[in-house]
């Protein structure tokens, strides 16, 4: 059994998608989302709980945790499941500085289907 599941994000709604929004002058902005091509359910019973982004610069032995976003609104209220009308979309933007290109890895957690992973290359100009 694999700890992290992976797949083509265009065919699987659980895979975190990494988009580099900006990578210039050492300033990096990265958007991570789940359900870009196929929307992931966001209900009290089935939702993405969090996304985490790590970065491993070229030549570095270990990756660095850039950040983590937790999603707490999944429709629950004092009136019961799926009654609040408030739902968080599993999308986060991370901003950081980097001196080298490297590998970006995002993790996401679905409360029903477990841990998922997506990867991308960060190329600095």
Swiss-Prot record:
GO terms for molecular function: iron ion binding; superoxide reductase activity. Its EC number is 1.15.1.2. Fe cation binds at residues 12, 14, 40, 46, 110, 113. It comes from the Archaea. The keyword Transferase does not apply. It catalyses: reduced [rubredoxin] + superoxide + 2 H(+) = oxidized [rubredoxin] + H2O2. Its cofactor is Fe cation. InterPro entries: Desulfoferrodoxin_Fe-bd_dom, Desulfoferrodoxin_Fe-bd_dom_sf, Desulfoferrodoxin_SOR. Keywords: Electron transport, Iron, Metal-binding, Oxidoreductase, Transport. PANTHER family: SUPEROXIDE REDUCTASE-RELATED. Belongs to the desulfoferrodoxin family. This is Putative superoxide reductase.
């Amino acid at each position: 059994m694999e700890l992290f599941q992976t797949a083509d994000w265009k065919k699987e709604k659980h895979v975190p998608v990494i988009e580099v929004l900006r990578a210039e002058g050492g300033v990096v902005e990265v958007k991570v989302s789940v359900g870009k091509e196929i929307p992931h359910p966001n209900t009290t019973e089935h939702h993405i709980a969090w996304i985490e982004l790590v970065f491993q610069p070229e030549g570095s032995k270990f990756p660095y945790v850039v950040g983590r976003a937790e999603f707490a609104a999944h429709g629950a209220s004092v009136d019961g499941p799926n009654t609040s009308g408030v739902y968080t979309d599993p999308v986060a933007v991370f901003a950081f500085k980097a001196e080298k290109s490297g590998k970006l890895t995002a993790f996401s957690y679905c409360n029903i289907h477990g841990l998922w992973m997506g990867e991308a290359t960060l190329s600095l100009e």
